Amino acid sequence: MLLSLVKFGILSVFLLAQEAVAIQLWNNTDGFSDDVPAAGRSALTFDVKCANYLVTARDVANGAALVGNLESHYCTEECHDSIDNFQRSSHLAYGTKAYALFKNSTARVVPGDIVNGLMWAYELSCIKDSTGYCLAGIYNHTKTACSECTLKYGAVMASSGYGRKQFPPNVFSSLLSSCNVPASSYTYVYTSSNPTTTPESSGVPSSATATPTSTCTGKTYIAKEDDTCKSISEAQSISTDRLVEVNHLDYSCSSLTSGTALCIEKNCTVYTVQAN
């Protein structure tokens, strides 16, 4: 499957009916440094009206997917519009200027990037096809590489700096080509954001955990129709064991399909043991 690059964990908490509540990333501005303009601080304590949690860019990058009725409670027009308003007010207050946002920290961040991450995480979490929400199915390998869900996922990943490291635009283009789907069917607008600015905690139900994502440090290869683990290993100079381990394939390689995005790293000289 396409996401054999990464091992994901699925949020599997089921909540009873919830009303949208106001959530703030920061309850007050006491922790902000003096570098942050007083006039714009209120923008960062914006009341976001979603369920009783926010899904951050870090959550989805670490493999979090909403399941059960969490999806329908979070993926609402009210939540989307509230995050959108938060995004607009933050951009209006701070633009693209970076600040030393927190006391006792010299790291300079663009406040708007944090909110961009919330909108990107919303769009990723709320991808749907005719059968329902997609993200959990993509993560647990029940959606095929050329499915509507996976192609929508690719477009959202390529649309932001938060997703491009795991799913670069050239990989998405190769996937569309291998699926014989025109790029015009899955267009996206790129929003440049610095992934280091995403909040570490979002308030997503704490009893659900996500498996940390392992990032590919090499290159990405798109499997072709006649590829096997052996042929890829030889052509890309990676041991078969390493190929299987990094991409979470089964050792018989039966899960390898055309269009699968594979991480190729720690190259070596491959030698196939001959008889005698």
Curated annotation (Swiss-Prot):
<feature type="glycosylation site" description="N-linked (GlcNAc...) asparagine">
    <location>
        <position position="140"/>
    </location>
</feature>
<keyword id="KW-0147">Chitin-binding</keyword>
<feature type="domain" description="LysM">
    <location>
        <begin position="219"/>
        <end position="264"/>
    </location>
</feature>
<dbReference type="InterPro" id="IPR018392">
    <property type="entry name" value="LysM_dom"/>
</dbReference>
<keyword id="KW-0843">Virulence</keyword>
<comment type="similarity">
    <text>Belongs to the secreted LysM effector family.</text>
</comment>
<feature type="glycosylation site" description="N-linked (GlcNAc...) asparagine">
    <location>
        <position position="267"/>
    </location>
</feature>
<keyword id="KW-0732">Signal</keyword>
<feature type="glycosylation site" description="N-linked (GlcNAc...) asparagine">
    <location>
        <position position="27"/>
    </location>
</feature>
<dbReference type="GO" id="GO:0005576">
    <property type="term" value="C:extracellular region"/>
</dbReference>
<feature type="signal peptide">
    <location>
        <begin position="1"/>
        <end position="22"/>
    </location>
</feature>
<feature type="glycosylation site" description="N-linked (GlcNAc...) asparagine">
    <location>
        <position position="104"/>
    </location>
</feature>
<keyword id="KW-0325">Glycoprotein</keyword>
<dbReference type="GO" id="GO:0008061">
    <property type="term" value="F:chitin binding"/>
</dbReference>
<keyword id="KW-0964">Secreted</keyword>
<dbReference type="InterPro" id="IPR036779">
    <property type="entry name" value="LysM_dom_sf"/>
</dbReference>
<protein>
    <recommendedName>
        <fullName>Secreted LysM effector LysM10</fullName>
    </recommendedName>
</protein>
<comment type="function">
    <text>Secreted LysM effector that might have a role in sequestration of chitin oligosaccharides (breakdown products of fungal cell walls that are released during invasion and act as triggers of host immunity) to dampen host defense.</text>
</comment>
<dbReference type="Pfam" id="PF01476">
    <property type="entry name" value="LysM"/>
</dbReference>
